[in-house]
Amino acid sequence: MDTLVEDDICILNHEKAHKREAVTPLSAYPGDESVASHFALVTAYEDIKKRLKDSEKENSFLKKRIRALEEKLVGARVEEETSSVGREQVNKAYHAYREVCIDRDNLKSRLEKISKDNSESLRALTEQLQCKEVELLQLRTEVETQQVMRNLNPPSSNWEVEKLSCDLKIHGLEQELELLRKECSDLRTELQKARQTGPSQEDILQDRDVIRPSLPREEHVPHQGPHHSDHMQHAYWELRREMANLHLVTRVQAELLRQLKTAAAGKACTQVGCVEDLGRDSAKLHLANCTAAYKRHPPLSPHGKATCYAPPSTLPGDRKAFSDKAVLQSWTDNERLTPNDGADFQEHNSYGRNSLEDNSWVFPSPPKSSETAFGESKSKILPSPNLPPLHYLDQHNQNCLYKS
């Protein structure tokens, strides 16, 4: 305002100066000067008044503007005061987001590290697996080669086991052989007793045809006189025949024991000739047609002599020797006709699997007349017809032992 007033005064002064410079010719008159000064004051006053109005308008506009700015400032302060809680939440959210980003970066780094470790471990495991597969393949090939070598060359342990089993079998066979020897000794003693107490063989040959028809009726009756002697002599012949068979069995068992011992010593390499001999001996013992039984302790007669029953024969007395020869010849033919497949030796059922249990011994009996081998004869084995059956039986036993 002061500047404006000063400007107005200056303007007045300039006007005055300008007016003073433009002196009119009538300036000498005092009335004209008063009119001019009055006119200048009026114009100056009007100009000042006009300027004052303008300044008042401007001042009111500025006040309005200041008031509006003050209102805006107050509103901004109120907004700032009200938005302080939101800012805190925004700050918290920002800090949380920053922490989450940091955790994400850490997890990414850990994941990369773990994936790298896993790839390395997987690579190492695959290499180990390949090595193990190669080792397993090598072990399989080694096992297969060892199995092939074992099949070709069995180890000593298997031979030892086989040797032990063979020794056990040999021990069992030796025990059976001892039992058979005891049986043979008992039978020999009984035969000697029967030979001492029995009558002559010629009387038995004369009385056999007369006594045989009466045998079925006297089966359960004690025998006396020539009938009893005939039965005793017949039992003697049967025992002699079975003794020959037992002797053959013992010879074959001894042969088998020797073969088993040689097989165990030679690592179970069985010779072809031994197998053929064993099959031949087993064929000799294959007496499938014979089923006669002999009791170890026969009942005694009232006179203190052992009684024995023999089945009746349908052949006449004059053909008795020929029938016995045919029996022996049929045995030899059956022995030769028996097939031999080279299998292991097996004892036949004809001589007593249960001999140690029921106190009895089962012997082979003569074949029946219905068999095909019955009646066949060979001149090189049969003795002269003048010899009694006992003598040619001994000769036949000797021939069998010689062949065995």
Curated annotation (Swiss-Prot):
Pfam families on file: TBD (PF12845)
Biological-process GO terms, alphabetical: dendritic cell differentiation; dendritic cell proliferation; mitotic cell cycle; negative regulation of canonical NF-kappaB signal transduction; T cell activation
SUBUNIT field: Homodimer. Interacts with IKBKE, TBK1 and TICAM1. Interacts with TAX1BP1. Interacts with CALCOCO2.
Subcellular location, record wording: Cytoplasm
Protein name, entry field: 5-azacytidine-induced protein 2
Tagged with keyword Phosphoprotein: yes
Keyword annotations of the record: Coiled coil, Cytoplasm, Phosphoprotein, Ubl conjugation
Modified residues (Phosphoserine): S330, S365
Cleaved signal peptide residues: none
Chief localisation class: cytoplasm
Annotated segments matching region Disordered: 332-351, 356-390
Function: Adapter protein which binds TBK1 and IKBKE playing a role in antiviral innate immunity. Activates serine/threonine-protein kinase TBK1 and facilitates its oligomerization. Enhances the phosphorylation of NF-kappa-B p65 subunit RELA by TBK1. Promotes TBK1-induced as well as TNF-alpha or PMA-induced activation of NF-kappa-B. Participates in IFNB promoter activation via TICAM1.
Organism classification: Eukaryota, Metazoa, Chordata, Craniata, Vertebrata
InterPro entries xrefs: TBD, TBK1-IKBKE_adapters
Gene Ontology cellular component annotations, sorted alphabetically: cytoplasm
Chain positions covered by the region annotation Homodimerization: 1-198
Parts forming coiled coils: 40-198
Post-translational events: Ubiquitinated via 'Lys-48'-linked polyubiquitination by TRIM38, leading to its degradation.
Residue ranges of the region described as Interaction with TBK1 and IKBKE: 229-269
Membrane-crossing residue ranges in chain numbering: none
